[in-house]
Amino acid sequence: MMTSVIPRGFPPRQYGVPGDRSSSLGCKRGGLARGGGGDVKDDFKRNTGNSARPMYSIVIPVYNEGSRVLSALGSVVGCIRARGWDAEVLVVNDGSTDSTADMVRAFARTAPEVRLLENPGNRGKGFSVRSGMLLARGGVALFTDADLSAPIEEAERLFAAIRQGADIAIGSRWLEKDRQTQRQPLYRQFFGRCFNTVTRFVMRLPFADTQCGFKAFTRQAAQTVFQLQTIERWGFDPEILFIALKRDFWIIEVPVSWAHDERSRLSYLKDGFKMLQEITIVRWNAFRGRYDKPVDAPPRTGEKQ
């Protein structure tokens, strides 16, 4: 019998109660409810004679990433092949106006692991992640940023947490600060910490880092959480964590290596107010019972999607 071992130096924080909660999630059998993936164009040509699913799905939202998307895909596919992962890569194009989509298509012709999804225009990072996670075929789905601030090799730390029984594993930049190989400028650290503190207080989230764009979900957790997600832009991370806790999923927060990318598009000054508005929307949704609705159960492995 094979046992999985969490990597050395792995002091995770755990939230929620482990165990089988399928009977308490309000799931029902049937097709997936329309979520972010409903209107997304999928370049993947399904082979109806082969219903096998990969073990892992890696979702990468992109918007005007022509300067680095090929490098990112090279790193991700190289890691998949070097480690022998049974994985697919879903690149979700959020209405890019540069050559991003064409570059991904060209890369995919030489890398069968890669498939391109196209949003109906520019809808936001939250929409892109939701689309990719709902269309992911893997037993475990992870989303990561195109800048690979968390090296894709760190995904193994999240996968290990899920093999140990977690429903969701989230990367954290703050549990082990010495794992940051390139720190943010002080002003970004300050605003980031302020936003994280406000978010944790308003939404009663216990996590050290809500905003790290490196999170992995079991298929059931992903299909439940992302069907209920409503925030489509930067503030979606706190919402999906709020939903996950509300639906009683077991979450492990895992320290990961991380390097700040100066090309990051998130501006805490410009986007911070909008994100604060979005967390108040989440609280309002919770008050109205938006996150208590039953959701469709995902097809079992081997069923056609």
Where would I find each of the regions flagged by the language model?
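Conserved donor nucleotide-binding strand/loop of the catalytic core
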Residues: A87, A101-L135
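Short beta-strand-to-loop acidic/aromatic patch adjacent to the donor-nucleotide binding site
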Residues: G139-D147
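Short loop->beta transition adjacent to catalytic acidic/histidine clusters or analogous donor-positioning motifs
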Residues: P54-Y56, V77-L90, S99, P112-V114
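Short, well-formed alpha-helical segments that are part of the catalytic scaffolds
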Residues: E65-I80
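Hydrophobic helical membrane-anchoring modules
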Residues: M2-R21, C27-R29, R34-Y56, R204-L205, ...
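A conserved acidic beta->alpha catalytic loop
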Residues: N93-A101, L148
